[in-house]
């Protein structure tokens, strides 16, 4: 399943990020890509050795960790270190699949269950640059407002179409979920959404408490901690 997570960053935060990223040191995006991806990747990434990168990636981690909808959809166990990329002048990233595991500075290794893109450029400011994801439900083309994030299974083939006008800047990361299975995670997310909707409409009740108990028992049964 694919999820749109709105408002991860405020407009003010997005403007500040863009201003700072204009001063960033950018390097060839293939430095973080395996052999297969390097054949189809043509973009730039912020140099991860810079002090600016360290500050901005911490802000992204704080923002997603504080976003309730992100937590409900991803049920994150481990977040990768966020990276930042830039596409311009017909740069693109052809169809590829993300690696199943990635190194992690604290945990050694992490499994990539979900991929996330946090858009930092207004969609009207550039042409092209759609994130195209192929999954069991078909093909999805994604171009979200700045500050919004999209979550999708890392097992999906995906690409970024050429940016033919303007500049597309984004942050991206991977998530190891407490729930490895996409279908189980989607069921928990739907159940959680319905519980929250019922609580806001009717207040607390024995029936809602029973559903909440069911949610946590399923999470307890399926989670890998």
From Swiss-Prot:
<dbReference type="InterPro" id="IPR023550">
    <property type="entry name" value="PKHD_hydroxylase"/>
</dbReference>
<dbReference type="Pfam" id="PF13640">
    <property type="entry name" value="2OG-FeII_Oxy_3"/>
</dbReference>
<dbReference type="GO" id="GO:0006974">
    <property type="term" value="P:DNA damage response"/>
</dbReference>
<dbReference type="GO" id="GO:0031418">
    <property type="term" value="F:L-ascorbic acid binding"/>
</dbReference>
<feature type="binding site">
    <location>
        <position position="158"/>
    </location>
    <ligand>
        <name>Fe cation</name>
    </ligand>
</feature>
<dbReference type="GO" id="GO:0006879">
    <property type="term" value="P:intracellular iron ion homeostasis"/>
</dbReference>
<dbReference type="InterPro" id="IPR044862">
    <property type="entry name" value="Pro_4_hyd_alph_FE2OG_OXY"/>
</dbReference>
<keyword id="KW-0408">Iron</keyword>
<feature type="binding site">
    <location>
        <position position="98"/>
    </location>
    <ligand>
        <name>Fe cation</name>
    </ligand>
</feature>
<feature type="domain" description="Fe2OG dioxygenase">
    <location>
        <begin position="78"/>
        <end position="177"/>
    </location>
</feature>
<dbReference type="GO" id="GO:0005506">
    <property type="term" value="F:iron ion binding"/>
</dbReference>
<keyword id="KW-0479">Metal-binding</keyword>
<dbReference type="InterPro" id="IPR005123">
    <property type="entry name" value="Oxoglu/Fe-dep_dioxygenase_dom"/>
</dbReference>
<keyword id="KW-0223">Dioxygenase</keyword>
<keyword id="KW-0560">Oxidoreductase</keyword>
<dbReference type="Pfam" id="PF18331">
    <property type="entry name" value="PKHD_C"/>
</dbReference>
<protein>
    <recommendedName>
        <fullName>PKHD-type hydroxylase YbiX</fullName>
        <ecNumber>1.14.11.-</ecNumber>
    </recommendedName>
</protein>
<feature type="binding site">
    <location>
        <position position="168"/>
    </location>
    <ligand>
        <name>2-oxoglutarate</name>
    </ligand>
</feature>
<dbReference type="InterPro" id="IPR006620">
    <property type="entry name" value="Pro_4_hyd_alph"/>
</dbReference>
<keyword id="KW-0847">Vitamin C</keyword>
<dbReference type="GO" id="GO:0016706">
    <property type="term" value="F:2-oxoglutarate-dependent dioxygenase activity"/>
</dbReference>
<feature type="binding site">
    <location>
        <position position="96"/>
    </location>
    <ligand>
        <name>Fe cation</name>
    </ligand>
</feature>
<dbReference type="InterPro" id="IPR041097">
    <property type="entry name" value="PKHD_C"/>
</dbReference>
């Amino acid at each position: 399943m694919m999820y749109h997570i709105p408002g991860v960053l405020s407009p003010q935060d997005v403007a500040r990020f863009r201003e700072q990223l204009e001063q960033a040191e950018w390097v060839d995006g293939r430095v973080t890509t395996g052999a297969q991806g390097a054949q189809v990747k043509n973009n730039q990434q912020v140099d991860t050795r810079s002090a600016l990168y360290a500050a901005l990636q911490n802000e992204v981690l704080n923002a997603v960790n504080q976003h309730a909808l992100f937590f409900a959809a991803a049920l994150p166990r481990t977040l990768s270190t966020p990276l930042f990329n830039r596409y311009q002048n017909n740069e693109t990233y052809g169809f590829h699949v993300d690696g199943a595991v990635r190194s992690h500075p604290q945990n050694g290794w992490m499994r990539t269950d979900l991929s996330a893109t946090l858009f930092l450029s207004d969609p009207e400011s550039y042409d092209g640059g759609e994130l195209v994801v192929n999954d069991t439900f078909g093909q999805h083309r994604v171009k979200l407002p700045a500050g919004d994030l999209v979550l999708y299974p890392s097992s999906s083939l995906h690409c970024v179409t050429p940016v033919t006008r303007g500049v597309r800047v984004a942050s991206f990361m991977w998530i190891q979920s407490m729930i490895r299975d996409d279908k189980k995670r989607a069921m928990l997310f739907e159940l959680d959404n319905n519980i929250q909707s019922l609580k806001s409409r009717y207040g607390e009740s024995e029936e809602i408490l029973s559903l909440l108990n069911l949610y946590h028992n399923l999470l307890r049964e399926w989670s890998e901690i």
